[in-house]
Every structure is written in C-alpha cells, then in structure tokens.
Amino acid sequence: MAGRELSHLQQLEAESIQIIREVAAEFDNPVMLYSIGKDSSVMLHLARKAFYPGKIPFPLLHVDTGWKFKEMIAFRDTQAKKFGFELLTHINPEGLAQGINPFDHGSAKHTDIMKTQGLKQALNQYGFDAAFGGARRDEEKSRAKERVYSFRDRHHRWDPKNQRPELWRTYNGAVNKGESIRVFPLSNWTELDIWQYIYQENIELVPLYFAAKRKVVERGGQLIMADDERMQLAEGEQIKEEVVRFRTLGCYPLTAAMHSEADSLEKIIEEMLLTRSSERQGRLIDSDQSASMEQKKRQGYF
C-alpha cells in the first residue's frame, strides 16, 4: 500500500524537525536564538513539536539591544511563561554603559556592538557549540549561499568560501573546542511558506505584524514608529497616525513600517501573493553599505 504523500508544508516541517532533533542529539550544548519575530515563532513551534510531549531540551536565547519594540518584549515574556521554555537574555554590558544607540551612533555601530558583539558574548559565556537561527535562503543574497550547518571559527566568523558540502541532507557537525555551528532549520522555506504555516498551525505572533493605526514618522522615505519617548525627531519631522504593519521586526528606530490594510492572516497571505518588494526593504541595517549583511555575518552576526 502506497504511503500518504506529504504536502509541501508537511515536507518542510518534517525536514526542519529532523534538523532540530539531529542537532539536539549531536551537540553537547545547543541553543535556539529567539528574535521574537515570525520566523522565530515558527522555529519555536517546530521545536515544541519535535520533542512533544517533553519540553524543549535546550534554552532559547534573546540578545536584547534595549531598542526592541515594547510589544516584542511583552510577547517574548508571555510566550516563555505560556510554554515553559528556558529563556536566556543578554545585553552587551559595555554597550549599555556607553549608551550606544541607533540615533547617536548610527545603525552600523549600534548593530555591531549591541547585536553582533552581544551575541558573541552570550555564546562565549554559556559555551554553546550550536546555535539555531531562523534565517531563510530567500531573504537575502548572502543567506542564499549559506549551508544549513554553517561552520563558525573560534571567533564566530563565517567564511563563505570554506563551507562544508551537504549531500543528500547529510550534515557535518564536527567541531573542535571553541568552534561552533549556526544551524538554520528554515533554510528552504520562503516568506510565503512561513505565513501559510502560521495560518495552518494557528501560531501566535507579535501584533505588530498586523495592520493597525500607529504613530509613525516619515524619514528618508520610510515610516519609523515612535515606540517610546526616546524617539529623536529631526527638524521639521512630525509624528502622525497611519494604518501600517511591519513585514519584519528589529530595533524600532531601524525598522520601517509599510502602509497596509492587512489586519488578519488571510489578508497578509493575499498581500504576499501580490507583492513584488523585498521582505527586508524595511530593515535599515541592510542599507549601511554594499554587501553589508555578508560582512556582518563574517564578523559573527547570525
């Protein structure tokens, strides 16, 4: 009797769960990076499925910058309490003491100190030898050429010219002391796959993904949400209310909203079917300079 044929989403789910289970079995001290966005929410859901009815056998790590949307932090804490996973948070103490922020120091310096260096500090502090990330190959060109198991040296650096072959979904997780692997279970998913899976599995998300009236400032052709009193206005700028949503989430001064009426999963999926713009066009850190994402990854960014 022929076996039941899996749907496209079921195939992706099975592949991701297999990767998560393999890493948990193969590595001594894995961790799942939790950025609180839609991809992290899907990855968390897959990890819960992978080990159900038991608990996730590794912690989740959120590298905080001090500039995430308030709704993101509230959602993070609610999810940890609801599902009972171990949540670790880290913020770069040196950057915090220096008052590093995206307004006064710029996106490149802020991202390097508070995200890249903060991540490396946390990985070193806890001695993690494998770190799950929610990146997908369709997001950005440097991620398109990265392996599922992405080898990092003792300094957490990625060398795109020195990647290990992955034939027939066979992954090489051999590392020496101090080295590590970044693991991307969602590598073969697309943005549309993510949204359709969220709809299918009824996965909770930060409300910022759904259209609503929000206070924003138009800056450089982008809509930046005034999330708290630290928002700095340039001369002539005014805060106004617009119906917007976010396609991607990060530090609020570096993440642009988009005009949208999509206030439900069905409407977001319909919008995704029609869009021709890049998912990361709202991430201001990607426009620092040419090939900036690859340079960040070479330095240790996830």
UniProtKB/Swiss-Prot annotation:
UniProt-listed Gene3D superfamilies: HUPs
Pathway this chain belongs to: Sulfur metabolism; hydrogen sulfide biosynthesis; sulfite from sulfate: step 1/3
Catalyzed chemical reaction(s): sulfate + ATP + H(+) = adenosine 5'-phosphosulfate + diphosphate
UniProt keyword terms in alphabetical order: ATP-binding, Nucleotide-binding, Nucleotidyltransferase, Transferase
PANTHER family according to UniProt: SULFATE ADENYLYLTRANSFERASE SUBUNIT 2
Subunit structure as annotated in this protein's UniProt entry: Heterodimer composed of CysD, the smaller subunit, and CysN.
Similarity annotation: Belongs to the PAPS reductase family. CysD subfamily.
Protein's recorded name: Sulfate adenylyltransferase subunit 2
Species of provenance: Shewanella sp. (strain W3-18-1)
